[in-house]
A protein has these predicted regions:
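Active-site-proximal mixed secondary-structure blocks
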Residues: 1-170
Length: 170
């Protein structure tokens, strides 16, 4: 696969459609270099502090949380529709117990700016370095949002990832 450097807004409509549908694939790497992937359905590409960013939400209970906290980086990968089953699987099992890349037939590929891998089978990749992290405060959440998404606690940490590079399959 050949990759071309593109801007943050390249195929933004595709990124948003996938996020609202089957989800995006968030990759990280643990301190030993083991890659991990999880599905995310919440996020926000944009501009903060005059920099391109991709904001993602990760719960502290997730294996990915530990990886991002340790390395300070992640990649948001935009899958094709044909990866719907992989997105489903990566959103339901933990990388602590499962080799999700292998189980889903996904190929980790070295990126250009971070150690977290790109996913070869995806069409767009946002390589990010954490600029800021904030924990959601349960008591400050809208009551309906709190009831629907945080009944058991485990509020997300919000990561503002500076876009170090956006790569598209050509």
């Amino acid at each position: 696969m050949s990759l071309e450097t593109v801007g943050l807004t390249h195929k933004l409509d595709l990124t948003l459609r996938r996020m609202q549908g089957q989800g995006l694939l968030l990759t990280s790497v643990d301190p030993d270099g083991k890659p991990n992937v999880m599905t995310i359905g919440w996020g926000n590409p944009g501009v903060v502090w005059g920099r391109p960013v991709f904001v993602v939400l990760v719960r502290p209970s997730r294996y990915t949380f530990q990886n991002i906290e340790t390395t300070g980086e992640f990649v948001v990968n935009v899958p094709t529709e044909s990866l719907a089953e992989a997105c489903e699987h990566c959103g339901t099992v933990s990388g602590r117990e499962h080799a999700k890349f292998k189980e889903c037939g996904l190929t980790p590929r070295a990126g250009r700016h971070v150690e977290a891998p790109l996913i070869e089978e995806c069409v767009l990749h946002y390589e990010c370095r954490v600029l800021q992290r904030n924990d959601l405060v349960e008591s400050q959440l809208d009551a309906d949002v709190r009831k629907e998404f945080y009944g058991a606690g485990d509020c997300h940490r919000v990561y503002y990832g500076e876009g170090l590079g956006t790569l598209a399959r050509v």
